[in-house]
């Protein structure tokens, strides 16, 4: 009986010990589980921070890129910088939230709140400062209580932007302007509807080259008239033959117009303007439309010319070389009522011709002819016919014109009436002669020919064909009839290739004007970002 009671007590004691032991084990197990969950939350927090740290720069840059393309697509700028900033910060907030959602997938006990997103300019227009607050909350029932973790994450740093499309340049038009205009008086302009080509001669007494943006080049010049039909300023076709030649800085400009393109045309008189003082790098010379025919031999144009024999083009000059006989001649033929002008270098050997001639001929046609009648003394000849007394005449002392470049002129007024003139490069007359006994009325090509002779060659710098007219022009002295130009402008070509990126080197300049910040440009430069004197990038295309 005594033994049984002791056994029962012992068994009960074992049960108590076992219960306590297993309860202790279970408690320790749950404690470890809770510790694992706490570490898991800590690891997740680090993942969130790393995710934000890795992605936030791209998120911010994407926000600006998105804002740029929104403006470009809708063709509508933000009304104020605050509206642009609100759009960008909203984009940053949404994209940051989306990025966190991807990390948070499957964690229902975690929540977060992006409570503040702010962007501000820095002293580098391509660097913005970002301030962002993110509050992360984790709540979880544990075996031994409840885990509540609150973690604020603060982003407070500068972010470098790159390759942000510039909608300001993309959507706006920019213009070259001209500072001055000079009046050119015109006389004897025919009262018909035909285009006429005439020349203007500038020099140091009638044109102030120093008022040009670049006096060494005619690139900035424009010649304008007035379209009396549309009542608009028009750009007239022109070509600068000579620029600032000689002691008097003579410039020769050829212009083409009709009476309806001249200001105040009345009884043969009117005027046009030459514009100058502009930064434009665009040369608007248009010799192809200034003349009936033109070539300056930058290359051989098979649409204009045929050829036989040998020729070379070097430094924009064509040299026809005799060999067995060589000729370069136009595909089109021309009759009377034309004036042919060219700059050429004849050499002292038989036989060379430039004018209206059949190819490979020095007698079937009319024009300038280097010819040797005696066999030992080739001279410059003016050919007006084929035989007898109608053949033409020599230029006196013609050797002075050989092996040098001069400007030669032939007016084919009619079959019988022809006029020959030699000019220097400033269109001063060196020699002139007229004939009334011509007998060649046929249509001929314009030909440049060197016939059979070992040493014969002739070189032409440029050549053009125009109408015959008696138009004259006068240019008032410096200070007279010069006015500020207020009306004419030309749209600047956007020579950027591909997308135009804000602050791209070589295409922008740094200015201390916050309307040129990227946010300022998002408002079409109508508002500044934060402070008016913060730096920004001004597109060079906007410079005059």
Curated annotation (Swiss-Prot):
N-terminal signal peptide: 1-22
Alphabetized UniProt keyword annotations: Signal
InterPro entries: DUF2341
Official protein name in the record: Uncharacterized protein MJ1472
